[in-house]
Every structure is written in C-alpha cells, then in structure tokens.
C-alpha cells in the first residue's frame, strides 16, 4: 500500500504520514498551510458519494450536488499546485435511481475517481443490481467479477473510457453493515476482487479498512487490527500486485482469448506477453482453454506466482479455476 486516501485529520501533522513513505490524497479537513509543498501529497479529495443525496454533498437535488462538486474542483484547480482532484462515487454508476442523467457529468468533473459498492458483504445489493439494466440477468453480486463490472460502469460514463483513472474500493472485513445477512469478506475474495478490478482496467485499488463484524481478533480498523494470518494473506496479495506494476502500467491490447465465462486482459513487457484471467459474471469454475494471439512463439506458459508451467498446443493452453475468485496470470515468450 502506498497511498492514504482522504487521510484522517486527527491533529497529527501531514509530515507524520508522509515521512513513512506514504503518498496522500488530502481531504477537505486539511488546510493548504498544513499541506504546504509536501511532495508526497499528490491530490486533493473532494466529496464522498456526491452521486447520492444526503451524503457527501448537501444539495437537495442532484444538480445542486453536481454544482457543489464543480465548485470544489474549481477551488482545487485554483490552488495551481499540480495536485489532482479526486472523488469517490457509489450507486450513481448503476444507472438507475441515483444521479439520473448526470453521472457522466460527475465523472468528468474530477481528474480521477473511485467507486464503493461492497458486493461481497452487503446483501441488499443483490436486489439493487437486479433492477439495474446493465447487470447480467441471474448474476450473483457476491463475486469477484462484480468489482470488475463496477469499473466497466465507470468507464461507460466517461466521454472516452478510461480518459481519467478509475479506482475500485474493496472492503477488508464487514464495512459497517448491520443486516443479519451481511457478510465478512475473506482474504481470498479480497484478492479476487482486486484482480477483477485490474483486469477491467482499474488504475488503483482502494481498501476500506473499517469493520464492525464483532469477531474475536478483529478491530474497528480491519487492516491494522486484523488477525495476523489474515493480515499476512492480504499483504501477500498486495505484494503480488505491486510486483507486476511494470507490466500493469503498460497499455493493454484488445484480445478475446476465447475462454467462455472468463474475463481477460492482455499486456506485453520485455519480450513476454501477459494474459490476466479471472471468472466473469455468470461464468462457471472448472477447466478453461485460452487462445493466444498469432505470433507468440513460446511453447510453455509460466503461471506467475504459482511455480508451475502449462504446455501450449496449437496456440492454445488449458487451465483450471477452482473458485469464483480464482485468478491466474500467464506469462508467455513472444
């Protein structure tokens, strides 16, 4: 982890955060004098969930919320300090009751945005998504693929998909939910959700670290106070993503790998192709066969981080996906 998004303003100095090496997106509680010229403060946060009434913005209509957002961004740009304007959105990306007809304006108002719909843990989201025209009929919200879908939705509301970076929020326990059928996410589900977001072109992963599941060993801050074994799994998942940053920061290629029920992303770096794969919405587990682009000469696929290889036969290879959150990264010589 390298960015503190909307760092809490609790009386600590900004330097006490950035001296650890962390970058910061400063919230509106921080004054310009407190932030100063600190080079590790890279952005200004605007508002949280302005695409829903009665939350981050105080307008009585969505139009008023949008204007409030635009005013805040104008103020930030007036600072002329080189820092980007950031916002977090939520249900507006569903394209139903929230911010009707305005979500493209909310997206274009800022330089980068995240979205938070906690699909694994919030049970009532299934009903909300079933009413969403873009949601595939019969798809289960409590899946990794639901996080990649949210990135797709953000991109749909951009004049050019991906013109500004899109981030996905992933919960790290049970994020202040109180319904009897709400759930606590597992580390394996967290990892799958993060990779689903990346496969769908997320440019950042935000982790919500607040918790109220009441389980022994869990604290309110569900990253720093998590049980040691859980924390180790989350740390390993994040390290795996960071290790592939040089690949992830390259341009993706348009390619259909032909494996039914999967989501894939193709990239290339230093003479190797990388195919990232996970289970898609309504996709099943089990055996999947992938087709490689013409011109790839490698006869062995390295499954990154899993200490195994797969033979390529006639430009194809087959692998297994045990769970809905299973994901694999394939490296092949070009």
Locate each region found by the language model.
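Glycan-processing catalytic domains of CAZymes
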Residues: 1-334
């Amino acid at each position: 982890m390298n960015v503190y998004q909307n760092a809490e303003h609790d009386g600590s100095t900004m330097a006490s955060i950035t001296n650890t090496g962390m970058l910061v997106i400063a919230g509106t509680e921080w004054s310009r004098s407190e932030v100063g010229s600190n080079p590790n403060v890279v952005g200004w946060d605007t508002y949280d969930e302005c695409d829903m009434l009665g939350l981050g913005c105080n307008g009585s209509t969505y139009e008023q919320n949008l204007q409030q957002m635009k005013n805040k961004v104008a103020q930030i740009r007036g600072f002329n300090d080189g820092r980007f304007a950031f916002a977090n959105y939520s249900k507006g990306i569903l394209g139903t009751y929230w911010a009707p007809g305005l979500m493209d304006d909310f997206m274009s108002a800022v330089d980068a945005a995240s979205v938070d719909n906690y699909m694994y843990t919030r049970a009532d989201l299934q009903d909300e998504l079933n009413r969403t025209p873009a949601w595939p009929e019969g798809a289960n919200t409590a899946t990794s693929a639901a996080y990649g879908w949210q990135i797709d939705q953000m991109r749909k509301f951009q004049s050019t998909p991906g013109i500004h970076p899109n981030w996905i929020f992933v919960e790290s326990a049970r994020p202040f939910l109180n319904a009897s059928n709400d759930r606590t996410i597992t580390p394996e589900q967290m990892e799958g959700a993060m990779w689903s977001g990346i496969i769908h072109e997320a440019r950042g992963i935000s982790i919500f670290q607040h918790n109220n599941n009441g389980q022994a060993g869990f604290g309110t801050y569900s990253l720093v106070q998590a049980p040691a074994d859980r924390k180790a799994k989350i740390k390993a998942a994040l390290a795996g993503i960071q290790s592939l940053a040089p690949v992830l920061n390259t341009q993706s290629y348009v390619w259909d790998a032909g494996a039914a029920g999967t989501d894939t992303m193709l990239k290339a770096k230093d003479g190797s192709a990388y195919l990232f794969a996970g289970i898609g919405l309504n996709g099943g587990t089990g055996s999947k066969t992938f087709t490689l682009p013409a011109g790839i000469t490698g006869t062995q696929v390295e499954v990154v981080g899993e200490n195994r290889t797969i033979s390529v036969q006639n430009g194809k290879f087959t692998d297994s996906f045990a769970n809905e959150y299973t994901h694999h990264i394939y490296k092949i010589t070009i």
